[in-house]
């Protein structure tokens, strides 16, 4: 066991060379209090503005005059900031390194080449009628053209909505409908772990429900023979050379939308988290520079898919806004062998490596030899993101991958926050395994009790942020009311994160996980309500309740209680069917790990499902079920306990 007492001090050489050492961190904390306007202005000054902002921050979380605006009179273009401004010095420097699913397939794109590809794709979009403000849905594998597609949208002021390649046709259709997007960018197929992903076929299926989508731009990637719909489908390789290799960047207001990214909440359908141009890019850029202590020429590798926010901020926008070199990996950690990550690090001489605890736990189980047979001496810094990292995994990462020398930045943030909020700075913060440590300067976390009362000192509670930061989401697309209700009404005047958290005597934050009905499965964020609605859409299911339970590798697993309709027999074959059904309805990553047949669900007399009890049963915490006497029928609990599925 690891105690809070285990502390890893900042290595002296790192502190000496870091962008931010302990003194600079303290100075930033003091400055943001004394001169917030100046502090935030300097963060924005990292970017190239067509018109620099004079209005820095205008924020109120109060219901009457709720508003979040940063740099609101500034004008800039994101793609110019990520590409054009680097061209004079870095035209021939590598912007993107690509490593394919199969070892031996890799390539690079220089800043000059990236500029040409982005301009050409932007011109294709324009030629097809895409205009500033239009929503473009992107459904692509992890390939450089995914970054190109995002930047091409940004170049002309179109709003991208990237949908993770693991989502099913139904999920894609829902996301296209919600933002009324008329244009889709996809590929014939993707590759993942030696298998093919039928991306274009999924789009064809999804578009049966979205007849208004007029155009699909398809990238030939694997070369598979896929049907094309005349008049609708265009092949990138056929049109790329028909347009100019130059496309002037569209001047955008700082508060113009940059992208929508759908994420799961505790209720209802996924929310379209909307990020805007100036604040988002400033925050992605600054956090990348500060937290990864990025130095010119270093190869940075974030293993997240661009379909999630981590891929947006730290595969594409953060690294490129800094003129950095970002590695895009098409594959998975264990293909063809569990050495793959470490081989890629040696092959491309990666300096900074950023991944998720779930990958580390899976690789840790395969034994140290897969790691230690590689050199790894190019590594300088390690990072973790997406879920709490258990101290065992942290220590393994530190010892086996980091050779007991490399700091690990455990970065806490969310789709909603745009970039990191609570994280160590490698040159400034002593590390405690399992703690995301301290807030970045200007970020104001607090812990509150159920009534919203601030809790002081070493304590545990719900994590809120009491003030804004530039990368904060601005709205839920199409539903501003839902934005306010979801995040600012539980604890009036504060942003509620949905996370539980402990703070120790040193002021270190330890995220304990979600306190709402969101679960984190292999670093993928899922709403239990979404899985429930997929299950009840099956003809045999009367009712379903889904909770998370601790899972050794995935962090959390999906545990589903299912009540069948009268007369339906509960068989193993049906159980398999239901798992397949959820894979098909949402995507493979949402498939239940466990299905328990539930003749009844524990409900209050008013009919509300008591999820707390279901969680305890799934977690095998049978001693702490709490008071069940208020249930409409307490005997259902006995049945659920007796027939609990082993996890
Ligand atoms: C969890 C991913 C502990 C947390 C960037 C949060 C973490 C949710 C950490 C957001 C971390 C993310 N330690 N928990 N370092 N990073 N989380 O929107 O529960 O996919 O609320 O954003 O992941 O997930 P999302």
Curated annotation (Swiss-Prot):
One of its GO terms (molecular function) is ATP binding. GO terms for biological process: acetyl-CoA biosynthetic process from acetate. Mg(2+) binds at residues 536, 538, 541. CoA binds at residues 192-195, 310, 334, 522, 583. The keyword Magnesium applies. ATP binds at residues 386-388, 410-415, 499, 514, 525. The modification N6-acetyllysine is found at residue 608. One of its GO terms (cellular component) is cytosol. PROSITE patterns: AMP_BINDING. Acetylated. Deacetylation by the SIR2-homolog deacetylase activates the enzyme. SUPFAM superfamilies: Acetyl-CoA synthetase-like. It comes from the Bacteria. Its cofactor is Mg(2+). Disulfide bonds: none annotated. Keywords: Acetylation, ATP-binding, Ligase, Magnesium, Metal-binding, Nucleotide-binding. Its EC number is 6.2.1.1. Catalyzes the conversion of acetate into acetyl-CoA (AcCoA), an essential intermediate at the junction of anabolic and catabolic pathways. AcsA undergoes a two-step reaction. In the first half reaction, AcsA combines acetate with ATP to form acetyl-adenylate (AcAMP) intermediate. In the second half reaction, it can then transfer the acetyl group from AcAMP to the sulfhydryl group of CoA, forming the product AcCoA. HAMAP family: Ac_CoA_synth. Belongs to the ATP-dependent AMP-binding enzyme family. This is Acetyl-coenzyme A synthetase. It comes from Caulobacter vibrioides (strain ATCC 19089 / CIP 103742 / CB 15).
């Amino acid at each position: 066991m690891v105690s809070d007492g285990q502390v890893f001090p900042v290595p002296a050489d790192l502190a000496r060379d870091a962008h931010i050492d302990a003194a600079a961190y303290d100075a930033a904390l003091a400055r943001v209090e004394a001169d917030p306007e100046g502090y935030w202005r300097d963060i924005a000054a990292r970017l190239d503005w067509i018109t620099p902002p004079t209005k820095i921050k205008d924020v109120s979380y109060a219901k009457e005059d709720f508003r979040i605006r940063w740099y609101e009179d500034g004008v800039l273009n994101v793609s110019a900031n990520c590409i054009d401004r680097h061209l004079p010095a870095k035209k021939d420097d590598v912007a993107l390194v690509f490593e394919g699913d199969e070892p031996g397939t890799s390539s690079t794109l220089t800043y000059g080449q990236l500029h040409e590809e982005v301009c050409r794709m932007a011109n294709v979009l324009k030629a097809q009628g895409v205009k500033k403000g239009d929503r473009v849905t992107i459904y692509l594998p992890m390939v450089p053209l995914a970054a190109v597609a995002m930047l091409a949208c940004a170049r002309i002021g179109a709003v991208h909505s990237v949908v993770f390649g693991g989502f099913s046709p139904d999920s894609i259709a829902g996301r296209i409908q919600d933002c009324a997007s008329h244009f889709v960018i996809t590929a014939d197929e993707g590759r993942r772990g030696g298998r093919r992903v039928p991306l274009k076929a999924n789009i064809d299926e999804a578009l049966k429900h979205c007849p208004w989508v007029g155009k699909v731009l398809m990238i030939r990637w694997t070369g598979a023979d896929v049907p094309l719909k005349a008049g609708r489908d265009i092949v990138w390789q056929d049109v790329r050379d028909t347009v100019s290799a130059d496309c002037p960047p569209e001047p955008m207001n700082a508060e113009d939308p940059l992208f929508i990214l759908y994420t799961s909440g505790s209720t209802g359908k996924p929310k379209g988290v909307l990020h805007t141009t100036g604040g988002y890019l400033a925050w992605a850029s600054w956090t990348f520079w500060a937290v990864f202590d990025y130095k010119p020429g270093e190869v940075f590798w974030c293993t997240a898919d661009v379909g999630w926010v981590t891929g947006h901020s730290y595969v594409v926008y953060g690294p490129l806004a800094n003129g950095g070199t970002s590695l895009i990996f098409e594959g998975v950690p264990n293909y063809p062998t569990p050495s793959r990550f470490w081989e890629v690090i040696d092959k491309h001489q990666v300096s900074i490596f950023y991944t998720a605890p779930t990958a580390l736990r899976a690789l840790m189980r395969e034994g140290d030899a897969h790691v230690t047979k590689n050199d790894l001496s190019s590594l300088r810094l390690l990072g973790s993101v997406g879920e709490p990292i258990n101290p065992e995994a942290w220590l393994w990462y530190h010892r086996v991958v980091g050779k007991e020398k490399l700091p690990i930045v455990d970065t806490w943030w969310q789709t909603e926050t745009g970039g990191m909020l609570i994280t160590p700075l490698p040159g400034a913060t002593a590390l405690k395994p399992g703690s995301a440590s301290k807030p970045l300067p200007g970020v104001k976390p607090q812990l509150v009790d159920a009534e919203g009362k601030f809790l002081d000192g070493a304590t545990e509670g719900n994590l809120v942020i009491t003030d804004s930061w530039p990368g904060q989401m601005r709205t839920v697309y199409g539903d501003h009311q839902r934005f306010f209700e979801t995040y600012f009404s539980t604890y009036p005047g504060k942003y509620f994160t949905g996370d539980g958290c402990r703070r120790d005597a040193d002021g270190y934050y330890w995220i304990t996980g979600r306190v709402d009905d969101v679960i984190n499965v292999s670093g993928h964020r899922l709403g239990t309500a979404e899985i429930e609605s997929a299950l009840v859409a099956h003809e045999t299911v009367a009712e379903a309740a889904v909770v998370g339970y601790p899972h050794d590798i995935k962090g959390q697993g999906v545990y589903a209680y299912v009540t069948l309709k009268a007369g339906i027999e509960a068989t193993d074959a049906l159980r398999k069917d239901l798992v397949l059904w959820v894979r098909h309805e949402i995507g493979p990553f949402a498939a239940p790990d466990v299905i328990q047949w539930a003749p009844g669900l524990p409900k209050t007399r008013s009919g509300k499902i008591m999820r707390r009890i279901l969680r305890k049963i799934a977690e095998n915490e049978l001693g702490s079920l709490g008071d069940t006497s208020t249930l409409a029928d307490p005997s259902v609990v006995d049945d659920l306990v007796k027939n609990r599925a082993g996890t």
